[in-house]
């Protein structure tokens, strides 16, 4: 195993990209993903501009490719693209600009699909365990990865906003359906409570309760949490 022959502490970035990540991305339709210019990607303008050392960019989708031995949630001192926690780096980039809405972050072990989360208090992402997926031949997991992370899901037509990609359209539709489902569920719960409450009060054993409700001794709020 080539990874085992690397010196201790080697991030294995080049090996991981060439021998593994490039193959996974090719299977997902990205082909050879172009590297970003020196310094990475820039968010903001003028004095507010800030550079983010993200390694690659496919269309409007940053794809930060790191080595097998790089932790995605912790900084790796002295390593380009990981001098601060890679996940936090990519998330901040998405949050600071409208140029990118979705991004991919991977070290070969796992692949994360991130989205701009300025309206949320935490991170918004989906993670795929590539190591377990391929070692365990988990075809259903790969099918899900293919469904969500294929290049056609994040592809943006020339001159269009990142929000026009299929992945964002699906997200918008899912949110709308979820709101409608909650509205229907709320109405159903209210109807069920009214039916149960009416039946409870009409039961012959509850004559005393009906009388106490009628004369105000017991209020509806006393029996409804």
Question: PLM features: residue spans?
Answer:
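Generic detector of bulky aromatic hydrophobic side chains
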Residues: 21, 28, 33, 56-58, ...
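Charged, often low-complexity linker/regulatory segments
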Residues: 1-28
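Residue-level signal for functionally critical sites in structured catalytic/ligand-binding pockets
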Residues: 13-14, 34-35, 54-55, 64-67, ...
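Short, basic/polar, glycine-containing "phosphate-handling" surface segments that engage DNA
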Residues: 1-8, 61, 65-225
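Active-site metal-binding core of divalent-cation-utilizing nuclease and nuclease-like domains
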Residues: 24, 28-59
